[in-house]
Amino acid sequence: MSSEKSSFPEKPPSFEKPSHSNTADHTRSGVHYFFAGWRLISLPGIRRFVILPLLMNIVLMGGAFWWLFTQLNDWIPQIMSHIPSWLQWLSYLIWPLAVLSILLVFSYLFSTIANFIAAPFNGLLAEQLEAKLTGQTLPDSGILSIAKDVPRIMKREVQKLAYYLPRAIVLLLLYFIPGIGQTVAPVLWFLFSAWMLAIQYCDYPFDNHKVGFSTMRQALRRHKVANMQFGALVSLFTLVPFLNLVIMPVAVCGATQLWVDRYRNLSATLPKKSP
């Protein structure tokens, strides 16, 4: 047989399990990466890239949650009125679930809007932090460098919305089913939010390396438990007053550390998106 290489295309990456040399990084939980983000935002040379996402998050999330809390007194009685009579005896349990449901739905909505607006700066933060963590030369961070990436970044954000909206609508419809809407739906929404927030923040370093959106999701599924842990903590801290004002840059930094440990060495083998 000929010794020449086959002309057939190579198989797509299968995201095989990591080698033993990287076992330590691959056994770290999503909890580890979430709390690593709090430390990373204060690294010398990184703080200045945290400021803009932080300020935007304070303005958007602060204003949004202030508005939400002014509406809760009107919304909760309306939700409780939809509870069927045979579940009235559980109203003392369903009431906090109803509050949690509203907070979960709107916190993710507010977070999505804030991330859409701040996406170019979050991408820059991820890029600069990755260079810092890997000892590479810091990339250009000028206005022109940011501006040329804006169309690509905004296109990626639209892809995320296209993935999110159909699934979110189906879950939101569950809230209108008596009984299920006040019990099962909040749990499903929390799990969905955890997955979407993992996608949202882990995507910044993937997109910086021009890894396609579907390929990125496939890679995240290989470590779904850790990514769900990370997303769940981001979701929970988004509900906590004051802490939710700084959660955006923290999550970007934690997700970038996760990329460096688990996915960066695979990036050369991952199919790139078309320009």
From Swiss-Prot:
The chain crosses the membrane at residues 49-69, 93-113, 169-189, 232-252. It is a multi-pass membrane protein. It is found in: Cell inner membrane. Pfam families: EI24. The keyword Transmembrane helix applies. Its main location: membrane. InterPro entries: CysZ_sulfate_transptr, Sulfate_CysZ. One of its GO terms (molecular function) is high-affinity sulfate:proton symporter activity. Keywords: Amino-acid biosynthesis, Cell inner membrane, Cell membrane, Cysteine biosynthesis, Membrane, Sulfate transport, Transmembrane, Transmembrane helix, Transport. GO terms for cellular component: plasma membrane. It comes from the Bacteria. GO terms for biological process: cysteine biosynthetic process; sulfate assimilation. Residues 1-24 are annotated as: Disordered. Residues 13-24 have a biased composition (Basic and acidic residues). High affinity, high specificity proton-dependent sulfate transporter, which mediates sulfate uptake. Provides the sulfur source for the cysteine synthesis pathway. HAMAP family: CysZ. Belongs to the CysZ family. This is Sulfate transporter CysZ.
